[in-house]
């Protein structure tokens, strides 16, 4: 897959997009895919070599919350509100509006304690909702949106970021059709 770096460094775009860091993750962890000497370009927020590494960092952080961190009340982090309170603390963000927006993306209440962040579809929707919230509407910046929730990146880039975080897209299987004279004839020679 080619690196998705189309927006890297473009100062007219949101910081998360131009840094290939659509979750606006701050410097701290030694993430895979960091730009060497990136702190010289942005002292606060990570710069990734491509967007899939930035997406990987979002997913890896959320999995860590789910597996190893606790909500404010000491329980497991398993609701949208608990994830967002950790991701975007209220001292810097309107966490209620953020959680409500993500709830609409996932089509569940922000307080429903049913999230499984090891589930590909759940994580994908959560990551795309975060990208959309953190980076805004691409049309505001004259960028043609992609036909998905985040609108900034094509599906392949999201899939690659999630794959790098250890989440693979489920494979759709088709039920086997029993062989009969009719079905065998449709595919070629029949042995009777």
Language-model region placement:
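Cell-wall polysaccharide-cleaving catalytic domain and substrate-binding groove, primarily
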Residues: 1-191
């Amino acid at each position: 897959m080619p690196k998705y770096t189309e927006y890297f460094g473009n100062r007219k775009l949101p910081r998360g997009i131009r840094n290939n860091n659509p979750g606006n993750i701050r410097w701290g962890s030694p993430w895979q895919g960091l730009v060497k000497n990136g702190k010289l370009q942005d002292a606060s927020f990570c710069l990734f070599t491509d967007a899939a590494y930035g997406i990987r960092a979002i997913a890896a952080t959320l999995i860590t919350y789910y597996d190893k961190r606790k909500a404010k009340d000491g329980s497991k982090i398993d609701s949208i509100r608990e994830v967002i309170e950790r991701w975007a603390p209220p001292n810097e963000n309107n966490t209620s509006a953020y959680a409500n927006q993500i709830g609409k993306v996932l089509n569940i209440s922000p307080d429903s304690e049913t999230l499984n962040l090891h589930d590909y579809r759940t994580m994908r929707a959560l990551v795309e909702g975060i990208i959309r919230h953190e980076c805004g509407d691409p049309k505001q910046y004259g960028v043609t949106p992609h036909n998905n929730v985040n609108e900034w990146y094509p599906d392949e880039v999201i899939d690659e970021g999630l794959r790098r975080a250890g989440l693979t897209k489920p494979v759709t299987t088709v039920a086997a059709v029993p062989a009969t004279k009719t079905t065998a004839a449709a595919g070629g020679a029949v042995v009777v």
